[in-house]
From Swiss-Prot:
This is Complex III assembly factor LYRM7. It comes from the Eukaryota. Pfam families: Complex1_LYR (PF05347). Interacts with UQCRFS1. Keywords: Chaperone, Mitochondrion, Phosphoprotein. Assembly factor required for Rieske Fe-S protein UQCRFS1 incorporation into the cytochrome b-c1 (CIII) complex. Functions as a chaperone, binding to this subunit within the mitochondrial matrix and stabilizing it prior to its translocation and insertion into the late CIII dimeric intermediate within the mitochondrial inner membrane.
């Protein structure tokens, strides 16, 4: 896959992730859309392969961070937030054991 195709794929992936992460939050959806479009337009004439690779890495990292670390909160009262985790953020509750396993 050529570099322009990879850039376009990252652009689309960021927008899909934005739609999932900020679902039902019009203000956050619009702000994220504007920021993504602004950053891509700002660098659309970049020709240096190293710089493009660096920016692609940054975009991929941002997408991963949005997907794995952002959770929505809804104001339900004056000082109360209700967290709305997405299904892909939930993990099974696994027992924690800090003792090393014994070799036999």
């Amino acid at each position: 896959m050529g570099q322009p195709a990879k850039v376009l794929q990252l652009f689309k992936t960021l927008h899909r992730t934005r739609q999932q992460v900020f679902k039902n939050d019009k203000r956050a959806l619009e702000a994220a859309r504007v920021k993504i479009n602004e950053e891509f337009k700002k660098h659309k004439n970049e020709t240096s392969p190293e710089k493009i690779k660096e920016m692609m890495k940054l975009g991929s990292d941002v997408e991963l961070l949005l997907r794995t670390a952002v959770i929505q909160g809804i104001h339900t009262d004056h000082d109360t937030l209700q967290l709305v985790p997405r299904k892909d953020l939930l993990t099974e509750n696994v027992p924690y054991c800090d003792a090393p396993t014994q070799k036999q």
